[in-house]
Amino acid sequence: HRLPRSVWKEAQYIVKRIEGRAPKIWHPKDSEGRVDFHQNLWDVPLHEGDWCVMARTNKIASQYAQALRSEGWVYSRHGHPSVPLKTYEAIMDWELWSKGNTLPADKVRNLYTFMKPGTDYTRGFGPRSKFMLSLDSDAMIGISEAKEKLGLLLDGNMLWHRALTKIDLDTKNYILNALKRNDNVK
């Protein structure tokens, strides 16, 4: 029940032509939807609504994914979002944390996985250190407490793309481009 009826019909038409394919029974959503054919990815008005972009081969689909990424469009492929969930959560959590909110210990540990030891936090306070793993999972931690007790070396006023130094530059630029176009990064 993932696809609208018109898209489901097109998918059924395609898969019925695949020789040796095991039949799979599945049904469409109740909505009708619409199927449009475009010769080029850039002919698609991506800024209007949600799109399911299909390609004849995985190679073409990979090229489309790379093109979408280079332009800052958020997408999912094979059920995986183009911005990994843990990365997205770390960005959102840093934004909350830097505004003075407290975070549960597990979210602080996730933040530390995107920081570099020795420059962003004191060595020995890594996300898998005995000390971090011994924190009560219900404990709420603020940035000032993390600086005092968890070896945090970063300024709480830093933007996420400066603070989360383990996120590679390409991914940071991709996410920043998506945010500029007001795309939902999740």
What are the language-model segments listed below?
Residues 1-186:
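The feature marks helicase ATPase cores and/or their adjacent C-terminal helical subdomains
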